Regions:
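Intrinsically disordered, low-complexity regulatory segments in ankyrin-centric signaling systems
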Residues: 1-39
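Conserved ankyrin/ankyrin-like repeat signature
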Residues: 32, 64-65, 95-96
């Protein structure tokens, strides 16, 4: 995996196995997520375990990234072990929950 030069992850990260979009979404980095989407990255990208960028953003309370991903076509109903909504609910992220329920 190749991340931007300022990324704290190594190019060949054997521990996390996070694709770029999932990684930046989990950190709430709107600019990096926008850049990847503009370059054609699938908004439904998942890691090896099926954890999506939308799930990562929702679970970590990054509403702006959640909205961006949804606006670019991320599947709100996608369910690995849990949906993005379920993850946000379990983490008590009320604004993310309210937004996802409004869709």
């Amino acid at each position: 995996m190749k991340l931007n030069s300022f990324s704290p992850l190594l190019e060949d990260d054997d521990e996390l196995h996070l694709p770029e979009l999932v990684y930046w979404a989990s950190l709430g980095d709107v600019e990096q997520v926008e850049q990847l989407l503009a370059e054609g990255t699938d908004p439904n990208q998942t890691d090896d375990d099926g954890y999506s960028a939308l799930q990562a953003a929702a679970e970590n309370d990054h509403l702006a990234v959640v909205k961006l991903l949804v606006g670019k076509g991320a599947n709100v109903a996608y369910k690995g072990e849990y949906t993005a909504l379920q993850l946000a609910e379990m983490a008590n992220h009320d604004e993310v929950v309210a937004y996802l329920k409004s869709l």
